[in-house]
Amino acid sequence: MSKTIDVAKYLIYAYEQISNSRFEMQELKLQKLMYFAQRESFALTGEPLFPSDFEGWVHGPVLVELRYFFEQDYVPYNGDSSALSETDKYIIESVINKYGQYDAWYLRNLSHEEMSWKNSRDGLDDSEVGNRIISNRRY
């Protein structure tokens, strides 16, 4: 299993623990929370939280690896967080505390304010499909 998947599973677990509500297989919300977690990791540590790259899609940053996350034999977090450091968990939980209360569309709109996403969409119409990589250096 990739670290990106480990982070996504822990993020869902942390969301459910912190908010005391189900995540309900919200792919759009997962994508945006993962984006903000990656951004937060760069801000706090100078390093990525996970190795996967985001692409600049119409509805914001997307991890292609997670595109069908809930549809492909999704198995929830099982309590094994050995792939994640305490710093990783702190970053994820901080993002949940800061952004978890917002719905997917609010987070989508918030991600559209990010320069990294704007740069990945440069020259594209609002509805035009795009798949430019959002470089880790652009966060």
Protein language model regions, located:
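Domain-edge interaction signal
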Residues: 1-139
